[in-house]
Structure formats: structure tokens, C-alpha cells
Amino acid sequence: MNDAFSTAQHRLDALGLRCPEPVMMVRKTVRQMAAGETLLIIADDPATTRDIPSFCEFMDHTLIASETTQTPYQYLIKKGL
């Protein structure tokens, strides 16, 4: 596991879920976080490779790291203001 992923303050397991469920769960989890906190998302839906980066851009969160070369995919996001 990438060192960046091991520093996450929150973790969300979205394995087995299909669009739009992973992004809906990310949104719900991020709402409960403070600005600046980080979330590790583990997913296996190929749609997340497009949806998670788009979600971050649209909602002003930062996609710190992603690993999408093999499943499970991993995403580390930092909550914006």
C-alpha cells in the first residue's frame, strides 16, 4: 500500500457496490468530516475511476492520490472547506 494511503484519517469500504452507490457513500462520509481531514476509499467499480475525481473537482475536495491500475481501486481525498 502506498504510504499516502496509510495516513488516512477515515476509511470507506465500497467494495461490491455499483454506481451510483460508491459516490453517494463518499458524499455521506465526507459530510461528517472536518475540513482538511482525509478519507481512503476502497472500491472495485470501474465507474469510480471517473466518478471519484469528478466528485472531488465538483465539490472542491482534493484527490491526493489514486491507485487504479488494479482492483481494488484506492483513492485518498482531502475534504475542502
From Swiss-Prot:
Keywords from the named record: Cytoplasm
Coiled coil: none
InterPro entries associated with the record: Sulphur_carrier_TusA (IPR022931), TusA-like (IPR001455), TusA-like_sf (IPR036868)
PANTHER family xrefs: SULFUR CARRIER PROTEIN TUSA, SULFUR CARRIER PROTEIN YEDF-RELATED
GO biological process, alphabetically ordered: tRNA wobble position uridine thiolation
Matches recorded under CDD domains: SirA
PROSITE patterns on file: UPF0033
Positions of the catalytic residues: 19 (cysteine persulfide intermediate)
Keyword Metal-binding in record: no
Principal localisation: cytoplasm
HAMAP family: Thiourid_synth_A
A single GO molecular function term of this UniProt record: sulfur carrier activity
Organism expressing this protein natively: Shewanella baltica (strain OS155 / ATCC BAA-1091)
Protein name (record): Sulfur carrier protein TusA
